[in-house]
A protein has these predicted regions:
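Extended, low-polarity transmembrane helix blocks
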Residues: 1-28, 49, 71-169
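Generic signal for short, ordered secondary-structure residues
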Residues: 18-19, 40, 63
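Membrane-interface interhelical connector segments
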Residues: 26-54
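Alpha-helix boundary/capping detector
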Residues: 33, 46, 65-67, 110-111
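Physicochemical signature of membrane-embedded alpha-helices that form the seven-helix bundle of GPCRs
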Residues: 51-54, 58, 78
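Hydrophobic, membrane-inserted alpha-helices
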Residues: 57-66, 82-86
Length: 169
């Protein structure tokens, strides 16, 4: 099980951090803060560039922490916050699970690793923290915090869509 958790955690964390560096620096074919900010603005997030930087930091920091198994509850919570916002943005455009599968997968993996712990090959284990900061209640807490932060983000930094003009039959 230790090797499976290491593989899952390291790959997921690295991939998630890679998405963050796309937003922050334009690495790996990303568009950087300006390009990603325009995309965020098109989803109704304002200011778009600031939200792109915040999402990029959440992904880069959360992914790096997850990859190393360091502060795993914080890492899983960061992953969940960013992914809940991404899923909500897609859902508000009436596209739930039409392109949101990756976001849902990251969310489930992040919260699952909070529940199981990072495994034997992790910084948390090396520091003797893994048994104290994992489990069901840590996962529930991480999900609740993520939902609350996401709700605040969606209600504070996302504008409501403009009313659609009525069409004649």
């Amino acid at each position: 099980m230790a090797y499976g958790l290491l593989l899952l955690r390291a790959f997921t964390g690295a991939a998630f951090a890679g998405h963050g560096t796309q937003k922050l620096f334009g690495w790996f074919g990303g568009h950087g803060p300006q390009g990603t900010g325009g995309f965020f603005s098109s989803l109704g997030y304002h200011p778009g560039v600031r939200m792109a930087v915040i999402a990029g930091l959440g992904e880069a920091v959360g992914g790096t922490l997850l990859a190393f198994g360091f502060l795993t509850p914080a890492a899983g919570t960061l992953v969940a916050i960013v992914m809940l916002n991404a899923i909500a943005a897609a859902t508000l455009k009436k596209q739930f699970l039409l392109g949101s599968e990756l976001e849902l997968l990251y969310l489930v993996i992040g919260i699952s690793l909070v529940a199981t712990g990072p495994g034997r090959f992790s910084v948390d284990r090396a520091l003797g923290w893994d048994d104290n900061i994992t489990g069901l209640w840590w996962a529930v807490g991480a999900l609740v915090v993520a939902a609350m932060v996401s709700a605040v983000t969606l209600t504070t930094f996302r504008s409501k869509p403009a009313p659609q003009a009525a069409t004649q039959p």
